[in-house]
Structure formats: structure tokens, C-alpha cells
């Protein structure tokens, strides 16, 4: 009972407990203020009790404004005197609130510049891709790559391709005759450089430097690898031969074809290049049918048809 009186006195404006033991007291308007024991919160009032009706009407409320132009929740301004009394005559009509314009996050010019930059970047990518495709096609076909802007076309036509260099080096190493040039002295070389093919002096045009043949080492390595391959093939596929009996018997050569374990032996004849069995090889050489053809075939591992 004492706690109930204490809460009742704390919730009232006067802060005094009621004289009687009742939990509610009649107010000025005949209404009783009940004690609220919940932990509710009120704006501008006491804890545990709602504000009075007069205080609620006098309490200004916060008005929210909308960004949409057609909706406005602000109250219209009223005219009045300094003492709060209204004028006798009707006041002028309140002007409508100005339209609130909504703005975008980015201006239109920025979007246009951005789209323009994207278009330029895509165009540059397409141009670079087209150039790469042209360069790849020209390299695969063996034609010279077209010169870029600002480069001399005549200088590129004087440079031979890699295929031509390899072919010339192969012909030179094979023993093909090459035209010999007479040795020129330093004075003759300087005179030839000073005068052009038509006899006119040329000093401003730079002479292209001679290209060094860098394929000699590759050819040497290729020859060595080919020799190793031939020796390996001679070991795997030795030379065989068969000579028919009799004064007019002829000798037929071939090589033992590489075979796996469990497979039938095959001999390739040199004259026709046919794959034959040992019995067929003996018959092909003119020996006829023999009981053991492998005993009549001579194997010579020192010789090979590839050497």
C-alpha cells in the first residue's frame, strides 16, 4: 500500500501523495488519472503518466516534409497579433508552398562523357584486335607485315623472311655455286657508298645494315640431331639381305622394321618398300619356299639404308 501511494505521488504534477488510500483521484474535469505501472515513455511528460490534454494541445509537433512536389504536410501560416489574438477581418489566403524539385545523383553531362569514353575504349580495343589479327595472318602466310604509320616501306621490302634465309643457307651448305664478288678495297668501298646505283651522290639516305645469318648454329644443331636420329634408327631397324642360291642369284636388301614383343616380324624391302614377312621376303628375292626363312636372311647392323 505504501509503494502504491509513492508511485501515485511521483506520477502527479504536484508530486504529493493522495490523502486517502485510494489509488486514483478525480481530476479537475472529473476524470481520474490512473497510475501506469508499465515502462512506457511519453514525449514531454512524466515517467509513467501521459501528459494532460492541455499540455498535449500546447505541445508543438514536428511536421515532416515530402520530397514529392504534390505532397506537403507543412501547416499554412496564420496571421495574428503579438499577443496571440486573431484579427477581426479575414486574412489573406496563404500562398501555396513552392514545388520541391528532385535532383539526380549525377548530372546528364557526366553520363554523356562516360558513355563517350566507353565508346572510345571499345573502338581502341577493336582496332588493336584487328591489327593483331592482320599481323598473325601475314606471319602465317609468309608475306611481309604492312608498315605502321611513319615507317619506310622500302626498308622492310629489302629484309628477307626467315624462310628465305633458311633456304639460302641450306642451298649454300649443300654446295650450290654462289656468285663470287671481287674483294674491294677501303677506297672502292667508300666510293661505292658515296655514289648510288644511278651514279648520283647520296649522302642523306642511311644505308641499311647487313643482316647477320643466325641460322648456321641452328642448322648445325639440326644436323647433329638428325645424325643421332639416324644412328638410333639404324640400331632399332638394322639392314638385312638375302642372296638367292645359284650362279645367277641376285641379292635383295631390306631393313628389319621395328616391332613389339609378341608381334610378327616385318621386313621392308628397299626395291619396292613393301612390308613382308621373312618367308615372303625370301620368295620376293627369288629363293622360293624354305622351311626356316630367318636362317637364310643375313642381318648386318653396321650398314643401314638411312646412312
UniProtKB/Swiss-Prot annotation:
GO BP, sorted A to Z: negative regulation of DNA-templated transcription; signal transduction
Biased segments, Gly residues type: 8-30
Keyword Nucleus assigned: yes
Organism domain of life: Eukaryota
Pfam families, A to Z: EAR, NLS_NINJA_AFP, TDBD
Subcellular location: Nucleus
Region (Disordered): 1-159, 173-208
Polar residues: compositionally biased ranges: 63-83, 173-183
A cellular-component GO term for this protein: nucleus
Family named by the database record: Belongs to the Ninja family.
Protein name: Ninja-family protein 5
Amino acid at each position: 500500500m505504501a509503494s502504491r501511494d509513492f508511485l501515485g505521488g511521483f506520477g502527479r504534477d504536484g508530486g504529493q501523495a493522495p490523502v486517502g488510500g485510494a489509488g486514483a483521484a478525480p481530476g479537475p474535469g472529473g476524470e481520474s488519472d490512473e497510475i501506469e505501472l508499465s515502462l512506457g515513455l511519453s514525449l514531454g511528460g512524466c515517467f509513467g503518466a501521459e501528459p494532460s490534454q492541455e499540455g498535449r494541445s500546447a505541445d508543438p509537433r514536428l511536421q515532416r516534409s515530402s520530397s514529392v512536389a504534390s505532397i506537403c504536410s507543412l501547416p499554412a501560416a496564420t496571421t495574428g497579433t503579438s499577443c496571440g489574438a486573431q484579427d477581426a477581418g479575414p486574412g489573406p489566403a496563404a500562398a501555396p508552398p513552392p514545388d520541391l524539385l528532385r535532383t539526380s545523383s549525377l548530372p546528364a553531362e557526366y553520363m554523356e562523357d562516360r558513355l563517350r569514353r566507353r565508346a572510345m575504349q571499345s573502338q581502341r580495343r577493336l582496332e588493336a584486335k584487328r591489327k593483331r589479327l592482320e599481323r598473325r595472318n601475314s606471319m602465317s602466310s609468309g608475306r611481309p607485315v604492312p608498315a605502321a604509320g611513319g615507317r619506310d616501306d622500302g626498308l622492310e621490302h629489302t629484309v628477307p623472311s626467315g624462310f628465305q634465309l633458311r633456304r639460302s643457307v641450306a642451298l649454300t651448305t649443300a654446295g650450290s655455286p654462289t656468285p663470287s664478288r671481287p674483294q674491294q678495297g677501303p677506297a672502292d668501298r667508300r666510293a661505292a657508298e658515296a655514289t648510288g646505283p644511278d651514279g648520283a651522290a647520296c649522302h642523306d639516305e642511311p644505308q641499311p645494315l647487313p643482316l647477320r645469318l643466325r641460322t648456321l648454329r641452328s642448322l648445325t644443331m639440326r644436323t647433329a640431331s638428325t645424325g643421332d636420329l639416324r644412328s638410333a634408327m639404324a640400331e632399332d631397324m638394322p639392314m638385312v639381305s638375302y642372296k638367292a642360291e645359284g650362279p645367277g642369284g641376285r641379292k635383295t636388301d631390306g631393313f628389319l622394321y621395328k616391332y613389339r614383343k609378341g608381334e610378327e616380324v616385318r621386313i621392308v624391302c628397299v626395291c619396292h618398300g613393301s612390308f613382308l614377312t621373312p618367308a615372303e621376303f625370301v620368295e620376293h628375292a627369288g629363293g622360293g619356299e624354305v622351311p626356316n626363312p630367318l636362317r637364310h636372311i643375313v642381318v648386318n647392323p653396321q650398314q643401314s639404308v638411312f646412312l
